[in-house]
Swiss-Prot record:
Palmitoylation and association with LCK contribute to the enrichment of CD4 in lipid rafts. Phosphorylated by PKC; phosphorylation plays an important role for CD4 internalization. Keywords: Adaptive immunity, Cell membrane, Disulfide bond, Glycoprotein, Immunity, Immunoglobulin domain, Lipoprotein, Membrane, Palmitate, Phosphoprotein, Repeat, Signal, Transmembrane, Transmembrane helix. It is found in: Cell membrane. SUPFAM superfamilies: Immunoglobulin. This is T-cell surface glycoprotein CD4. InterPro entries: CD4 (IPR000973), CD4-extracel (IPR015274), Ig-like_dom (IPR007110), Ig-like_dom_sf (IPR036179), Ig-like_fold (IPR013783), Ig_C2-set (IPR008424), Ig_sub (IPR003599), Ig_V-set (IPR013106). Residues 419-458 are cytoplasmic. Residues 26-396 are extracellular.
Length: 458
């Protein structure tokens, strides 16, 4: 009796000692669906020896017979292999290609009368829909995992956005910065496996852009895409809402086929010009106040639901002098924070306001600058020269004209003076002649009268 007790205790101790050894010998390996995994098995001696790989059902997968690799009747027979070049080093690993979720199992390596267990867990991460999505659409990632596993998933977008979840991860309202390679890490039993998923967000590089131009300048609108596709087919249109117009109108419609652009219809006023290749490019011959406003370019891609959008704004500046008034105006969508100012060159601003028009009465002569600024940064500038009322110095042509006018006035004055003088002399001569005649007549008349008086009888 007493001899049996120590024996039972010894047997129990041996069982307890053996159990942890089996657990410690079991390794966990994570694999990716469609990828290749290598399950290692090493002998204590670096030499070629007999080995066998089996699954949990004790079905032989592969092994060695003599110096040749043999395969069993398992489902992995056409996808399993071993590195023969490493057998002499005591390495008898099994390589499984094109992994499937159902390959998840416990695999047993028998070598040197010992067994090594490796638990393989295969995961797959896929996008539920196409990986080419329009901006604003939702992305859903689904994790495929073997039964009985409880993995966690953490994904990071190219823009630094972190998203965590279980077997399903949803990303609403994709943005253009989400385009690129997403890195997702699957964790299970303190082991990790990393997935790389390329997501293409179909969008323009900019959601909105503003073009600032002086009146009369040529305007260039550009709409570069934030993605590249080998075959790109679709159609587009530019709608424009001028600031002075009551409603918007279509300026141009076009087709896009294999990156070639062809215009379908264009307005006559204004008559836009469009480039024939990507990026989408429009030219407005002249920036005029009646064109200032905002537009919306839409692009519908073939086999895609929804459209790409980009807003574009045009701000036009005019600096003009009318009589004694110098005016600076802008048309188009501007922020209330923008400042419009008029200043004489190399001097401080004469007038500066958060308004769309400023003016100066009786401006000094010189070069004036009309400036549209945002927090000190000049967005648009137009120069206008103010000419003085009396130019200094007087130009030679002006001297000639003034001399001619003065000479003409002097000649006219002298002519009038001499004419008046001549006429006065002539009239004076006539009067003297008349007086002489009268005096002459009086003398001839007195003699007869005196004679008659003297000779008359008493």
């Amino acid at each position: 009796m007493n001899r049996g007790i120590p024996f039972r205790h010894l047997l129990l101790v041996l069982q307890l000692a053996l159990l942890p050894a089996v657990t410690q010998g079991k390794k966990v390996v994570l694999g990716k669906k469609g990828d290749t995994v290598e399950l290692t098995c090493n002998a204590s001696q670096k030499k070629n020896t007999q080995f066998h790989w089996k699954n949990s059902n004790q079905i032989k997968i592969l092994g060695i017979q003599g110096s040749f690799l043999t395969k069993g009747p398992s489902k992995l027979s056409d996808r399993a292999d071993s590195r023969k070049s490493l057998w002499d080093q005591g390495c008898f690993s099994m390589i499984i290609k094109n992994l499937k979720i159902e390959d998840s199992d416990t695999y047993i390596c028998e070598v040197e009368n010992k067994k090594e267990e490796v638990e393989l867990l295969v995961f797959g991460l896929t996008a539920n829909s196409d990986t080419h999505l329009l901006e604003g659409q939702s992305l859903t990632l689904t994790l495929e995992s073997p039964p009985g596993s409880s993995p966690s998933v953490k994904c990071r977008s190219p823009g630094g956005k972190n998203i965590q979840g279980g077997r399903t991860i949803s990303v609403p309202q994709l943005e253009r910065q989400d385009s690129g390679t997403w890195t997702c890490t699957v964790s299970q039993d303190q082991k990790t496996v990393e997935f790389k998923i390329d997501i293409v967000v179909l969008a323009f590089q900019k959601a909105s852009s503003t073009v600032y131009k002086k009146e009369g300048e040529q305007v260039e609108f550009s709409f570069p895409l934030a993605f590249t596709l080998e075959k790109l087919t679709g159609s587009g249109e530019l709608w424009w809402q001028a600031e002075r117009a009551s409603s918007s109108k279509s300026w141009i419609t076009f087709d896009l086929k294999n990156k070639e652009v062809s215009v379908k219809r264009v307005t006559q006023d204004p008559k836009l010009q469009m480039g024939k290749k990507l990026p989408l490019h429009l030219t407005l011959p002249q920036a005029l106040p009646q064109y200032a406003g905002s537009g919306n370019l839409t692009l519908a891609l073939e086999a895609k639901t929804g459209k790409l959008h980009q807003e574009v704004n045009l701000v036009v500046m005019r600096a003009a002098q009318f009589q004694e008034n110098l005016t600076c105006e802008v048309w188009g969508p501007t922020s209330p924070k923008l400042t419009l100012s008029l200043k004489l060159e190399n001097k401080g601003a004469t007038v500066s306001k958060q308004a769309k028009a400023v003016w100066v009465l009786n401006p000094e002569a010189g070069m004036w600058q009309c400036l549209l600024s945002d927090s000190g940064q000049v967005l648009l500038e137009s120069n206008i020269k103010v000419v003085p009322t009396w130019p200094t110095p007087v130009q030679p042509m002006a001297l000639i004209v003034l001399g001619g006018v003065a000479g003409l006035l002097l000649f006219t004055g002298l002519g009038i003076f001499f004419c008046v003088r001549c006429r006065h002399r002539r009239r004076q001569a006539e009067r003297m002649s008349q007086i002489k005649r009268l005096l002459s007549e009086k003398k001839t008349c007195q003699c007869p009268h005196r004679f008659q008086k003297t000779c008359s009888p008493i």
